[in-house]
Every structure is written in C-alpha cells, then in structure tokens.
Amino acid sequence: MAQFLRLCIWLLALGSCLLATVQADCSQDCAKCSYRLVRPGDINFLACTLECEGQLPSFKIWETCKDLLQVSKPEFPWDNIDMYKDSSKQDESHLLAKKYGGFMKRYGGFMKKMDELYPVEPEEEANGGEILAKRYGGFMKKDADEGDTLANSSDLLKELLGTGDNRAKDSHQQESTNNDEDSTSKRYGGFMRGLKRSPQLEDEAKELQKRYGGFMRRVGRPEWWMDYQKRYGGFLKRFAESLPSDEEGESYSKEVPEMEKRYGGFMRF
C-alpha cells in the first residue's frame, strides 16, 4: 500500500511538470501566431492556448495557428537570437584579431577571465586606470609613475574587453600623439632620441652615465677566454687584441666613439 501511494505521488509530480512544460510551449506558440498576424485580434490567445492543451473540444484555432507556424517558422526573430549573438561574437573576435594580430591569441582569454571574475562596478568606472592596474597586476604597464602610460594601457584593456568609449578613445589618441615625444624622453632618458637634446636631458644622461656607466663593463679578461683561444685556434685572437688592456684603459677612454660616450660602456663587451 505504501509503495502504491508513493507511485501515485511520483506520477502526480511528473504529470504536473509535464503539464507546466506543455502550457509554456502552447503559450509560446500562440504568442508567435499573434505576432505573425497583421491583426493580432484575429486569434483568441486564451482559446488557442486551451485548445493546444486539449481542454477544449474544438481545435479550429489551434490548427490554424499550427499551420501558420509551419509556414513562417524561419521568419521569427526570437528563433535566431542565439545565431545572431554567435555571429556578432565571431565578428568582434575577428576584428580584434585583425587589429592586434596575435595579441588576443596570447592574452585575450586571460583578460576575459579576469573581467568575469572581477566585474567593474558603476561607481568605479571613474577610476578605470587604477582598477585595471590592480586587476591585472601591472600587466601591460611600463612605468607606474607615468600617467600617460597608465592611460594607454587602460584604454587598450578597455577596448579589448568591450568597455571602452569610442569618443574617449579618439580624444585620447590625439592627446597621446601630441605627447608621444615627451613620454619617450621621460621614459628612456634620451635613449631613443637623436643627437639634439635639451640641457636638462643632457644632465640627466650624464648622471645616469656616472651611476650605471660601468655596471655591465668587464674588468680584465675572464679565465674561459684562454680556453676559447685554444679551442678555436686564432679565430678570436684578432678580436681579443682589439680590446684595450687595463693599462691602456685611461688612454682608451679618451678615444672612445660617440656611442660609447653616450651610454657609458653599457654596449661594450
């Protein structure tokens, strides 16, 4: 007896679930018919739903609606919503891949994952640069003290994640073009500039030369140098003789070329 009651309860629960599913499908189909008709009043929505569910003896309205659905099924906009979304996502990914080359293949999934884990709140949009810097841990950040560099990385990340503004990007591109030379000189201290430099940058270059000039410079010759000479015969002998000795260092420093003076022995072997 207990098993029979349990079976009846399960049948009632299953029947109610199936009934709810059928009712939802019937309501959706009747709504499509009303949308497709030029005059929605031609079909009674309630009668169509009841006939679809089998609660009315007549099936005239439901048969008409079913024929209409079979004829005009591909024309309903909500049937192709998923297809439109997929095509739009593919177009956006194609444009980003075309614009940034292989950058999105390497880091696109990383930034999208971080954007899903840490969504930006509306009140935090004003400080977008700081939030992006905290979120990505300095990713794409060259110099934390430069506002232009941080703004550049912020705009790039916003554009890749779909949160940028076109007008803001256009205005910022104009400003970054005007300040490109200043940011380059600040970042590299005249490294990428030509021979003509301002006195202030010249003084900064001299200070850097005094501080880091001989940092990478070798003192004397390493022990493995003789091993290379023995192994390769006299192949490296000419290059070894061209290097100045410790005694000739002072006289050699007076004759170094302009490149050596500028970078303070940084490029010297």
Swiss-Prot record:
UniProt-annotated location(s): Secreted; Cytoplasmic vesicle, Secretory vesicle, Chromaffin granule lumen
Keywords: Cleavage on pair of basic residues, Cytoplasmic vesicle, Disulfide bond, Endorphin, Neuropeptide, Opioid peptide, Phosphoprotein, Secreted, Signal
Tissue occurrence: Expressed in brain, heart and testis.
Annotated region described as Disordered, given as residue ranges: 165-191
Coarse class of the protein's main subcellular location: secreted
PANTHER family named in the record: PROENKEPHALIN, PROENKEPHALIN-A
Family: Belongs to the opioid neuropeptide precursor family.
Protein name: Proenkephalin-A
